[in-house]
């Protein structure tokens, strides 16, 4: 508990940084070309970074499961001149969740640690993030994830089947009206999933498709931003769609964007005016009383579809690590009764304004 309190205190200090201190972080700059494999690794000079992995898989009985694994890195700018190895120069957090459509249950867990001592780290030359017995690592063919949560375990492999999808303008993704409100951002859609999930001692072999996001920034959100709605969809025809909107304090759209990659590889970058999220149905959490628009109509460029959740209750309580509540859930996309694809919907800032 003392370690957790120290971590949350460090995050709080980071949130109180003024604009001048923000300039002490590395900044997102136009014209920078992402370099792989280097940019698969961590970028510790930036304030915030995450590796976000979600997917739909089926077990041996044909049941649908939703998987989510996210690792976060934060540079709080606290005690950076302190020579002690215990100084919290870099903080790491992780969330994992398992949604079971058959039982309607959601299991989730979280981790938090200061980087160091070989127990928590995010390597810079490749994707290799570790907190104790939770890890996400790059392999020769893709990625491997190992999670030993309190109620479930993941031993999953993710094979790359498509090229990296650079979001925004060649990997620079605007997140607000000011140019500096941006991130470096790429995705890897249509990852082929294999491996096992263990729940209550029962090990199940699973297979399916996943989506990986890697994003880093030092000034992600405008001060008037409340949160965001985001989707990442593996389309049934082999294409991929990412779309988001940043909401202001009144619920309006402060900024929006996305990318649609066709099955033939052509990419269309979506401008703010081409993306629209319209709530169709809301769900209220019985635990927190927070209300989320779990079913949505989405317009992304020239396509329009409805999102329906695998199940309504996919709220994640991460107040013990990253200090917030959010809805992160498996969804299907349909248009005219036809399934267009499967993916994940993220809804933040519905409990309180999101602070990164």
Q: What is each of the regions a protein language model found here?
A:
Residues 6-18:
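Bacterial N-terminal signal peptides
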Residues 1-4:
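Positively charged n-region of N-terminal signal peptides that target proteins for export
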Residues 23-356:
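Structured soluble/peripheral alpha/beta segments that form catalytic or ligand/cofactor-binding pockets
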């Amino acid at each position: 508990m003392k370690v957790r309190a120290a971590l949350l205190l460090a995050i709080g200090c980071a949130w109180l940084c003024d604009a001048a201190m923000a300039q002490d972080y590395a900044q997102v700059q136009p014209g920078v070309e992402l370099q792989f494999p280097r940019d698969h690794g961590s970028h510790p000079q930036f304030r915030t970074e995450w590796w976000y992995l979600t997917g739909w898989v089926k077990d041996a009985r044909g049941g649908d499961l939703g998987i989510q694994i996210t690792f976060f890195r934060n540079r709080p700018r606290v005690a950076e001149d302190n020579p002690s190895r215990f100084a919290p120069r870099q903080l790491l957090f992780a969330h994992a969740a398992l949604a079971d459509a058959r039982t309607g249950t959601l299991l989730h867990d979280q981790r938090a640690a200061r980087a160091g001592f070989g127990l928590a780290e995010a390597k810079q030359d490749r994707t290799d993030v570790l907190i104790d017995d939770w890890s996400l690592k790059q392999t020769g063919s893709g990625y491997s994830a190992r999670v030993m949560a309190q109620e479930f375990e993941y031993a999953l492999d993710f094979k790359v089947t498509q090229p990296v999808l650079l979001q925004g303008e060649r990997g620079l993704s605007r997140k607000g009206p000011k140019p500096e409100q941006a991130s470096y951002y790429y995705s890897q859609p249509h990852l082929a999933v294999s491996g096992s999930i263990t729940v209550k001692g029962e090990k199940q072999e699973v297979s399916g498709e996943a989506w990986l996001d890697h994003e880093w920034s030092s000034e992600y959100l405008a001060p008037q931003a409340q949160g965001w709605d985001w989707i990442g969809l593996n389309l049934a025809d082999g294409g991929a769609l990412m779309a988001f909107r940043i909401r202001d304090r009144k619920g309006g759209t402060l900024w929006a964007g996305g990318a649609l990659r066709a099955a033939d590889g052509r990419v269309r970058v979506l401008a703010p005016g081409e993306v629209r999220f319209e709530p169709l149905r809301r769900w209220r959490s019985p635990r927190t009383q927070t209300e989320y628009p779990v079913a949505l109509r989405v317009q992304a460029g020239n396509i329009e579809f409805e999102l329906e959740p695998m199940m309504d209750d996919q709220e994640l309580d991460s107040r013990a690590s990253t200090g917030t509540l959010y809805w992160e859930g498996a969804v299907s996309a349909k248009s005219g009764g036809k399934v267009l694809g499967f993916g994940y919907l993220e809804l933040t800032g519905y409990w309180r304004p999101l602070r990164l």
